[in-house]
Amino acid sequence: MKYIGPFLRMNSLKRENIENQLFYFSKESLKYLVLNSKCGLTIPTKDLLKSTSKFDINIFKSNSPLLCVYKKGNCKLDLENNVLSLNYKKFKKEFNIFSNSLMTLSILEMAEYYDGFKGIDSEKYNLGRLYKGLARKQLEFYAANLRTPEGVFTDKVDSSDELFDETKLENKNEKFRFSDHILMMDAYYRYSIMLNDSISQSYRVFSKDILNMIMNFKEEIYTVSTDELSKICLGLNIYFNYCN
């Protein structure tokens, strides 16, 4: 990132140059966060690719894909075993619904981008396939672990004991937020229209159920804060774009 300042100050830059450079930074940042940061709960790559045919696991065997991303981590990298990595002791082990739904949406958008490399660059194309498989696992995890018994998505705290290989999550705040559910609706709907697999139709129905719930309680939106309203507008605009 230390080069972005001088880059943007160049007088000869065109809008297209800036857009391309920012896109590169964003996709590489997403790739590092999702596959290498370990800033959250991870899934072994071999487990992720079991259902993916004709996939060379050696390409991504050193990665640790995220099922769910933590709320916060220190961006300063530490050198450990000759590898730069985030300091896991600085992680704030909370799972934010809004952040995780945005992560999955970003993964799906990049998966569509990498689809364009079919027959051109096998490594990039396979990265897109990996993203699709990861998005499915993430959505399965959210539905099973980030909801209350009543089915409401809620932020969680990771209280797992490092001595035991078992994930333990506790509710942090059971307050209902429209924006959380709308972004989750977007993520499930995006998956359903992008892939044609055994779970796609179920995800589409699930996203429609969330939409119906939002419509049934739409009068409550008038009472939310300006910040929450901005997030609601963002989520609804994303959904509208996907529907068209």
Regions inferred by a protein language model and the residue ranges of each:
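Glycan-recognition and catalytic cores of secretory/periplasmic carbohydrate-active enzymes
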Residues: 1-244
